[in-house]
């Protein structure tokens, strides 16, 4: 549960990634136009937590690349009908300037011409779709969502969907515990077996259900966003070594964080995980999920 009393953490941060790690893809970075970022930060200041690095999109990319991150997955979401095309054009323009950025399209479920909006985004080079149920307040079983599933599946594009119940806020216009249930995600995975789905935050707070679904469905991935930080009041966060190793991706939620940019990657580096598992978590699984085809001459590290 989010509340305005969640604190900033004054932890120290370094100017580069920890040593001896495989190449790092951050699979969960938010990129918005400045005006929308300002609105997002105002919301967090009021209802969430203090954000340490309030940076614009270009500054975010420079910040992370300069500190050793090899590749970034740029995420966005449309908070209302009518803004999706503009957001998709914005993300596509960032991708044309940064070859180490893979951008996701977005759409407001149920808005007019939603399917064509996504197809246009794919034609601009965007590699998948990001939706946020808490903000967009959609029913995952609705016809408008089924249309999105079909478009993504038909075009081989993955769907990153904040479908977990947490972190929720009373400021949302809908109740995430009502509209976000692991059973709903299970239906999507079953009905659209060719659709690759990533649920962020390890599926918080239905960790056990999502861990079981990882074993049952080859089209489900999870990301670690904020779950390694020991910040949110979530109980029983699973150990990464207990989860299906080829279906977990590292992500941070940068820049919308109340702590050091490298808090989670440091903790990951201290877990003494096998190098093969680290490689999967930090880049191999993201390359597979997002179907990122790197130039053979490019150096991921």
Which residue ranges define each predicted feature?
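Mid-to-C-terminal alpha-helical segments outside catalytic/metal-binding sites
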Residues: 1-27, 37-38, 42-66, 70-71, ...
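Histidine-centered catalytic micro-motifs
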Residues: 24-34, 160-164, 199
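Active-site neighborhood of phospho(di)ester-bond hydrolases with catalytic His/Asp-centered motifs
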Residues: 24-27, 73-75, 104-105, 130, ...
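Catalytic pocket-lining loop regions of alpha/beta-barrel enzymes
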Residues: 2-6, 127-128, 141-249, 300
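Short amphipathic alpha-helices and their capping/turn segments at secondary-structure boundaries
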Residues: 10-21, 61-62, 118-119, 144-155, ...
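Active-site gating/metal-coordination segments in enzymes
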Residues: 3-7, 70-71, 79-168, 218
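Active-site environment of divalent metal-dependent phosphoester hydrolases
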Residues: 32-35, 79-82, 109-113, 136, ...
């Amino acid at each position: 549960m989010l509340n305005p009393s969640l604190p900033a953490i004054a932890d120290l941060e370094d100017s580069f990634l920890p040593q001896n790690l495989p190449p790092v893809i951050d699979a969960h970075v938010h990129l918005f136009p400045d005006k929308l970022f300002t609105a997002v930060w105002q919301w967090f200041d009021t209802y969430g937590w203090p954000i340490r690095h309030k940076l614009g999109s270009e500054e975010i990319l420079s910040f992370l690349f300069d500190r050793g991150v090899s590749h970034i997955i740029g995420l966005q979401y449309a908070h209302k009908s009518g803004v999706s095309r503009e957001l998709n054009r914005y993300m596509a323009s960032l991708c044309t300037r940064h070859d180490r950025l893979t951008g996701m399209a977005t759409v407001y479920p149920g808005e007019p011409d939603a399917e064509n909006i996504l197809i246009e985004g794919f034609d601009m080079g965007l590699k998948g779709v990001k939706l946020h149920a808490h903000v967009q307040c959609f029913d995952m079983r609705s016809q408008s969502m089924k249309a999105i599933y079909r478009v993504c599946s038909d075009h081989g594009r993955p769907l990153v969907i904040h479908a977990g119940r947490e972190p929720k806020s009373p400021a949302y216009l809908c109740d995430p515990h009502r509209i976000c249930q692991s059973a709903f995600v299970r239906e999507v995975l079953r009905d659209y077996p060719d659709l690759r789905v990533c649920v962020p935050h390890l599926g918080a707070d239905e960790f056990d259900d999502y861990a079981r679904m990882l074993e049952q469905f080859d089209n489900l991935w999870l990301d670690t966003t904020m779950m390694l930080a020991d910040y949110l009041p979530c109980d029983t966060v699973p150990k990464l070594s207990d989860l299906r190793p080829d279906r977990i991706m590292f992500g941070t939620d940068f820049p919308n964080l109340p702590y050091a940019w490298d808090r989670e990657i440091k903790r990951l580096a201290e877990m003494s995980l096998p190098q093969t598992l680290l490689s999967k978590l930090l880049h191999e699984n993201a390359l597979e999920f997002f179907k990122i085809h790197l130039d053979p001459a490019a150096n991921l590290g």
